[in-house]
UniProtKB/Swiss-Prot annotation:
<dbReference type="InterPro" id="IPR028987">
    <property type="entry name" value="ATP_synth_B-like_membr_sf"/>
</dbReference>
<keyword id="KW-1003">Cell membrane</keyword>
<dbReference type="GO" id="GO:0046933">
    <property type="term" value="F:proton-transporting ATP synthase activity, rotational mechanism"/>
</dbReference>
<dbReference type="GO" id="GO:0045259">
    <property type="term" value="C:proton-transporting ATP synthase complex"/>
</dbReference>
<keyword id="KW-0812">Transmembrane</keyword>
<comment type="function">
    <text>F(1)F(0) ATP synthase produces ATP from ADP in the presence of a proton or sodium gradient. F-type ATPases consist of two structural domains, F(1) containing the extramembraneous catalytic core and F(0) containing the membrane proton channel, linked together by a central stalk and a peripheral stalk. During catalysis, ATP synthesis in the catalytic domain of F(1) is coupled via a rotary mechanism of the central stalk subunits to proton translocation.</text>
</comment>
<feature type="transmembrane region" description="Helical">
    <location>
        <begin position="12"/>
        <end position="32"/>
    </location>
</feature>
<dbReference type="InterPro" id="IPR050059">
    <property type="entry name" value="ATP_synthase_B_chain"/>
</dbReference>
<keyword id="KW-1133">Transmembrane helix</keyword>
<keyword id="KW-0813">Transport</keyword>
<protein>
    <recommendedName>
        <fullName>ATP synthase subunit b</fullName>
    </recommendedName>
</protein>
<dbReference type="InterPro" id="IPR002146">
    <property type="entry name" value="ATP_synth_b/b'su_bac/chlpt"/>
</dbReference>
<keyword id="KW-0472">Membrane</keyword>
<keyword id="KW-0375">Hydrogen ion transport</keyword>
<dbReference type="GO" id="GO:0046961">
    <property type="term" value="F:proton-transporting ATPase activity, rotational mechanism"/>
</dbReference>
<dbReference type="InterPro" id="IPR005864">
    <property type="entry name" value="ATP_synth_F0_bsu_bac"/>
</dbReference>
<comment type="similarity">
    <text>Belongs to the ATPase B chain family.</text>
</comment>
Amino acid sequence: MAAGEEAPSILLPAVYDIVWSAVVFVVLLVVIWKYALPRVYAMLDGRTEAIAGGIEKAERAQAEADAAKAELTAQLVEARAEAGRIREQARVDASVIAAEIKEQATADAARITASGTQQIEAERQQAVVSLRSEVGSLAIDLASGVIGQSLADDQRSTALVDRFLADLEASETAGRTGSAS
């Protein structure tokens, strides 16, 4: 080695290496800056817009879901209130119908009782009339046989039978009143 030349340093590279390395670094920096970086920024902007759009869409969907939930809650409250009104109206209607049916049944029972009473009274009157005529005929026949004369006069025999039956009824009524006391 010559005295004027120095030995290359291990830590410090040669000047031409530094210059060429700086030129290549600047060229790569310009290429990245000019071509790659705009594409990366465009891709990042697209992703940012997509994420922001997704967040906005999710917020709108959440707002719609909250509105739908509030509407459904209101409808549920209204439906429960309507069901309560319907139940109450059904109770009122049932009590009205039950009262009407009870009133109708009472009226029907009274009508049937009155009809039965009238029918029994009519049959009793018919039986009394029938028995009077038969008893009268038998009494006249019996009296005719006992006294040996004919009691053919209808008016006189009818009056006799009626008087006899009236006396019989009066004695029966007196007997009932006396035994009841």
